[in-house]
Every structure is written in structure tokens, then in C-alpha cells.
Amino acid sequence: MRRLHATWTAAGTLLSVMAAGLSAQAAISLPRDFDAYVARTMKQFEVPGLAIAVVKDGKVVLAKGYGVRRLGDSARVDERTLFGIASNTKAFTATAIGILVEEGKLQWDAPVVNYLPWFQMYDPFVTRELTIRDLLVHRSGLGLGAGDLLWWPSSTYDRKEVARRLRYIKPATSFRSAYAYDNVLYSVAGEVIEAVSGQTWEDFVSSRILGKVGMTASSVRHSAAAGAGDVATPHAPIDGHVRPVAPFTSDNVNPAGGINAGAADIAKWMMVQLDSGRLGDGSQLFTPRTTRELWSVVTPFRVGNPPPELAALRTNFAGYALGFGLRDYRGWKIVSHTGGLPGFVSRLTLVPDQRLGIAVLTNQESVEAFEAITWRVLDHYLGAPPTDWISTFARLKARGDSITAAQERAAVTRRDSTSHPSLPLERYAGTYRDAWYGDVTIALEGGKLVLRFAHTPDLTGDLEHYQYDTFIARWRNRELRADAYVTFALKPDGSIDQVKMAAVSPATDFSFDFQDLLLVPAPAGPSR
């Protein structure tokens, strides 16, 4: 959902790792220095708090919290502390579909329009042919993150309207020809679940999955975390310093990323997945047939060579299944997914033939932290030679940060600072309309241009002249970290023909799909 993205001065607090574990005796199955390794990871990557779950052979080896829920506070993370697991929710949505298939209410390869007659994609052929399976495997022809601006940042569109507006989004590739990660089609899957079950996605997943698995502390709404007592605060690096950020609370895309969970509950979820749907009482949430569907690659990835530091992670195959990704590692099949929201990133990893599951939930946007911990645990159980994953991922992060900084500096040096806008500022003001998003307004206020997305309050920004007829939208909510170029194209008579946008920084989250907008002057009449 979000990108898998300063020194924290509270090192003493970080190093005094304290956790409430479910099974202290079972924890000896992990390396003896594991807690120290976690503490070192957290210090290196400035993570205030995280939770880890490890299951093996049907038993909980570890379900434990480390660090603090909020930077500067004393409340500790424990095994029940809730984290936004973001796109790790997608496996729950795919499992819900699998349950309904087993009940005969859905078919994996039936067209979506059989269940949602109102549903449309841009291409009528795709509308007719898009199946339930296609909703879950990122091969619809939509571009990366296409349509995410309909819900991110929090918008006034409800889930059905987000799905309805897909009909206006042009495809980036031909149908089923390429992988491009999306979120909006998982929301459509949520609409399908409601149509055939008579329950909202939230009610179905809560009663038919969380309740039966025993995930009693978990919730299915982004908005629910705010009212929970034992909940982690999201953090992110802002202007070089890690600090708390506002949680994402909109519920219009819950089927793609709305679940909040802690280590204890995620441990239960992993055990059910590893045991082909078998619950603690011996009953089946789903059957092995659904497991085979969930874990079979549908959309293959092109496999290349990783950076030299990650030579050990070279894979022979990789692809996307149903709510899970698959690859191999040292001869073992790995089933996994990651998740990202503002201030939260997580990773869930299963090794079916080892009956091993690992989950790392963090309250800081450090993909490097969960990677370093996950691969350390995998190496331990798979008998792999030791690798200093902390140093490895620290070097990769430093290199990536350096490349991004160089690209941002280059954009500044390329700017023609002697140029001026072609028109007086008031001539740029007006209402502009994109076919799938709707209206964006630009107004002259106090001698400066201000841009506002009509359905997204957080996308309000001051336009700063960059060069020629290009401005930069500096969003007033600086937590977005997504400033965007705004370029006006003029007609021969000097009037504005269209407006295009693009992210300024290459590190901008892909869900800010500004590049997909084509804004044209809106005709007189009601706004859209």
C-alpha cells in the first residue's frame, strides 16, 4: 500500500528491551543472542517499537514486543499491541474469497460482473473478462498504484465510489500481460464479498476469520486503532528526524489494508495458514484446496540478479499468488507479503515445508529493520551460513539514500532560475477536472496560487514557481512527503489546455499516482 521505506537519542531506552512473551521456554529455539540482535536492529534503523511472532511445527516459539509504543513515552510494546499491518490484510481478503468459493457462492474464474453488474473497467473487453482471481493478482493492466489517489490520502469517496471510478482509468498495459501492484481492485473484492455474503467485508472478516482463528485483539478498520488502548503510534523520518505521525484512519480501502493486529494474534493466523485452514478445535476454516489456490503463482515476476550484498537472496522463481507472494530461498519455497502505511511497515513470511512462520510488525517506516530480522530467523531455522543482515541492509539504505539525494539535487541544478511564468498568476486560477479523480481547484490567495484536491483535504498545497509554466505543489501537511510538479500546457491563444503532475522526489510513495492525472479546464456546472 505504502512504500517499504537522524539518530534516535533514546538509545538507552531502546537497548533496555523488555517484552511480554507467550512462551519463554519455547523461545530458546531462537538464537541465544536474538533479543540483542533485535535491539541492535532497532538502534541501527531508528525503530521505536516492534513486535515479532515466530511459529514452528504448530507451536508459538515467540510472540513478543520490543521497545516503546510511542517515542518519548514509557508504554512498552507487548504481544498484544496493535500495529497497522497494511497490505498483509490482502491475504485475509483472499482467504475470505476462498471460503466463499468453498461454500459455492463464488468461483475463482467467474467474471466479476456476474456478482457486481455495475462494475466497469476502462476497456469493455476487460470489464467482461476480469475474474475474481484477477482482482487479487495485480495483472489487470492498471499501472502501479493506479487510482490510489481516490482513497489516499483520506478522501471523501466511499468504497463503492472508488470502485465505480475505475471505469475512467486508462490501462498502462494490455490485460494480463504484466505485473503492477494495485490496491483498488482489492477494494472491489471487498464489494464482491458483501454482494454474495450479505455482510460487509469488515463484518465477514471479523466474524468468519478473526473470530474463528481467535484473533480477539485484532480489528478490521483503520479507524478502530484510534480507540484501542494497547496500540502502537506510527512514526516516520520527517526532515531527518524520526517522529510520530498521524495515523491513517479512512475505511474506504480496508479490504486492501485495514487490519490492525499484534504479535499474539498474527501467530495464530500463521499457524492456521500453515495447517491448511485447521483451527485449534480441529475444525477447518478452509480446506487444503484453498491453500493450494492461495499459494500458487498466477503472475510471475522477472527474476534478476540482486545487488552483490544480497547475493544470498538470489531467487530461481518469484511471483504473486492470491494475497501472497512466492519465491525460493536456499531451496525452500517462501510464501510472504509486506505491508506499509504511514508510520507502519510489516512483513509476514511462511516456509510451508518447515511449518515455519515469521512476522515482524514495526511502528517506523524501516523496511530494513523487518528484513534484517526476518532473514536472521530464516537462516537460523534453515541452517544457512550466518550473514550480518543488519550491516548489509544498513549499507543498502545508505546507498539508496545517497542516490535519492543526488537525484533531488540534480532537479534543483537543472532549474532555470531566470525563467518566469508565461501568464499572470490569476490566469492559472480555475477549476480543473480529471476523468477519474474529479476536480482540482487553483485559487490566487494573498498573491500566491493555492491548489486543492476537491475530495482530498490533505492535498492542499501552495504553488511555488519552479521554471517556465511548471510550479511545485508544497503540501501544507508536511507528513505527506510528496511534493509534486504542476505543469501547465498552453494553447496557441495563451489559454490553458491541460495540467499534468508528477512527484518531485523519486522516493515518493507510489500511491501518490499524480502522473496518471490529466487535468483540463472544467466546464461550468456542478463540481465532480
Predicted features along the sequence, with ranges:
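N-terminal secretory signal peptides that target proteins for export/translocation
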Residues: 1-6
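Short glycine/proline-rich turn/loop motifs
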Residues: 73-77, 165-172, 245-252
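Mid-domain, small-residue-enriched loop/turn segments at the edges of structured enzyme/sensor domains
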Residues: 131, 184-185
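Catalytic loop of the DD-peptidase/beta-lactamase superfamily, centered on the K-T-G motif
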Residues: 25-63, 151, 194-207, 211, ...
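Catalytic nucleophile serine of serine hydrolases
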Residues: 87-89, 180-183
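Active-site helix/loop module of the DD-peptidase/beta-lactamase fold
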Residues: 33, 49, 71, 79, ...
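Bacterial N-terminal signal peptides
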Residues: 9-23
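A short, polar/charged loop-to-alpha-helix boundary motif
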Residues: 69-78, 368-376
